[in-house]
């Protein structure tokens, strides 16, 4: 009580200074609150941008056999998962010598919605006979495919001297390589998308994306964890 009385007495004796001090405190609190709000808002904006650009997932498991996907689906720490399967390479008439292929990838609906598939034109594939292509096919490969066109691809495994090659193996003009075990498939181009983050800049194939509900023999599985899973 004594301290309170002394404080009130001092405030009354120094009204002007007290008013200035009070205003200063209010302004400081307002400034701190504004800065905290800006930081939080900026952080949320960065998170949303990253989700939209590169995908809304936390972990990825590569080359998961089809028979093991059910174990991931039933894992209580996993809130959601998305399936991506590399179907193979097909030779196209690209004008970029370092990128002579289409690399055909299938995605399930969840993957298309959560892995940064940004449409420029058209729509996403809804069946296994539809496909979307990246803008870089035209800007980099000088191929003028349009939405509504049909494209026939001989899709197979890229190989050199008996070794299987993937998107992390750049195309070497001086090295002999071939596409083996090809299967011919005709697709309707239903959309054009921005280049996806899952395609390395040095990749030899432009990523063409088709639809698949259940994946294939080997899948890259992108997972989004529960809060409990994140803590563990």
Language-model features: where?
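Transmembrane alpha-helix boundary/anchor motif
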Residues: 33, 37-41
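N-terminal Sec/SRP start-transfer signal
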Residues: 1-33
